[in-house]
């Protein structure tokens, strides 16, 4: 899973680990799983007015279309009860629990702190690039 923070950073920066992960996704070298909730969050965040001037419309639409076309749609797994810092991130935990790799790549690792207790690996973009690219 690429947390929304990584997608946004990758589309804005055009260099660095987040950008490399997004580029790898577009080039079919990184395969992502998603749920309808993740697709919705990507669409909602990328449509925010403050991102209109920094992320090209083609990129905003392209990542949604690419995810729908080549991503793995999974049924969300039940998320164990825990002291989750940001419940808005639970769709990513739910999807990670539903796939073999059980990995979330994020710029906000603290939001996923309890995930390790349930077998989910939380990586920074740099760690994700080293592990998956």
Describe these PLM feature segments.
Residues 1-34:
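Short, well-structured N-terminal submotif of metal-dependent ribonuclease cores
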Residues 10-11, 45, 54, 115, ...:
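Residues that scaffold the ATP/ADP-binding catalytic core of kinase and kinase-like folds
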Residues 69-109:
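Active-site neighborhoods of divalent-metal-dependent phosphate/nucleic-acid chemistry enzymes
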Residues 16, 33, 55-58, 83-90:
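Residues at secondary-structure transition points
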Residues 90, 97-105, 109-133:
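Acidic, PIN/NYN-like endoribonuclease modules and their adjacent C-terminal/linker elements
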Residues 5-6, 62, 91:
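Active-site phosphate/pyrophosphate-handling residues
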Residues 24-79:
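PIN-domain endoribonuclease scaffold, especially VapC-family toxins
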Residues 6-7, 38, 110-111:
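Alpha-helix capping/helix-boundary segments
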């Amino acid at each position: 899973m690429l947390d929304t923070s990584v997608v946004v950073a990758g589309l804005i920066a055009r260099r660095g680990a987040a950008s490399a992960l997004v580029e790898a996704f577009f080039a079919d070298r990184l395969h992502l799983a998603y749920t309808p909730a993740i697709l919705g969050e990507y669409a909602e965040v990328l449509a925010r007015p403050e991102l209109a001037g920094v992320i090209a419309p083609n990129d905003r639409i392209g990542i949604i279309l690419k995810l729908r076309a080549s991503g793995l749609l999974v049924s969300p797994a039940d998320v164990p009860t825990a002291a989750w810092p940001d419940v808005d991130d639970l769709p990513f935990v739910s999807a990670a629990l539903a796939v073999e790799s059980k990995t979330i790549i994020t710029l906000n690792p603290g939001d996923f702190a309890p995930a390790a207790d349930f077998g989910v690996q939380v990586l920074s973009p740099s760690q994700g690039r080293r592990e998956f690219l």
